[in-house]
Design a protein with these regions (language model features):
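Selective for proline/serine-rich intrinsically disordered segments
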Residues: 2, 36, 46-49
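Non-catalytic all-alpha helical scaffold/repeat segments
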Residues: 45-55, 59-256
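Sec-dependent bacterial lipoprotein signal peptides
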Residues: 1-20
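Residue-level detector of functional hotspots within protein domains
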Residues: 8, 40-42
């Protein structure tokens, strides 16, 4: 007959092993670092010339505006990744992205014309910074002070592109990709539940981000032979129900 103390010791050992296994699994599911962000109005650097200012009104060309928005090289490399990310979101010409027929062309222009976003994508912790920030974005009406404004909704779409762009995707582990996809799906469901406040365009930004996370390789190449899906991915049109249903199934299969 076994000593009752031996039974207790075995139970304790089993509990410890179970806890250790659970802890290990948890770490494998999420190894993103939680990051706090500074107040956007108290950054160490801000754009000296902005739309509406007297200086801005003197510009005669778009190139002058682009030049005025560059971050000085002596400052750029010394900014923390958190600050740099927020500065990228405050880029005065950010809305230029929406001036293109294809979403991908708009973001390509942003990356070509702004040294801040190029530097951000090169940072080793860019993926952790942007994911941590996206997690903290509140889409519920009672939590978002700028909820119904175009600028807030557009900003969310920009973040969703950035979180799924190839230089950031290349930094994700397999488990991190799934975690990002899960967070995107959560945000998508909130948007769907409040569709009157989120135009179809901004539902598409989440769908496209999910496609990039699930179907793109590290170079950002979409793995599909489906022309319609490829065109939707590029942002050439708003998706018909058949494409949305297809994407929903891709998401379901990936996260099941």
């Amino acid at each position: 007959m076994k000593n009752p103390f031996q039974k207790i010791n075995l139970l304790i050992l089993f509990a410890v092993l179970l806890f250790s296994a659970c802890k290990k699994d948890s770490q494998e599911i999420s190894d993103f670092e939680y990051i706090g962000f500074p107040n956007e109005n108290e950054l160490s650097w801000d754009y000296p010339t902005k739309p509406g200012s007297d200086k801005w009104k003197t510009f005669q060309s778009h190139n002058e505006m682009l030049e005025a928005c560059q971050i000085p090289s002596t400052i750029l490399t010394n900014l923390s990744t958190e600050e740099l990310f927020l500065i990228c979101l405050k880029y005065p010409l950010l809305m230029d992205i929406s001036a293109f027929n294809f979403v991908t062309d708009g973001y390509a222009s942003y990356e070509t014309n702004f040294n801040g976003i190029r530097e951000f994508y090169q940072r080793s912790n860019a993926s952790s910074v942007i994911y941590s920030y996206y997690q903290q974005v509140k889409l519920e009406k009672n939590n978002a002070t700028l909820y119904s404004t175009i600028s807030f909704v557009f900003r969310v779409s920009v973040i969703e592109y950035m979180i799924s762009v190839s230089p950031v995707i290349s930094k994700y582990s397999t488990t991190q990709r799934k975690e990002v996809a899960t967070e995107l799906l959560s945000k998508l469901n909130i948007k769907k539940s409040q569709k009157g406040d989120f135009p179809e365009t901004y539902l598409n930004s989440t769908y496209r981000a999910l496609i990039r996370i699930i179907r793109c390789d590290e170079a950002g190449t979409l793995s599909t032979d489906d022309t319609k899906l490829a065109n939707y991915f590029a942002g050439g049109f708003s998706a018909p129900e058949s494409i949305i249903a297809q994407v929903d199934e891709i998401i379901r299969q990936y996260l099941k």
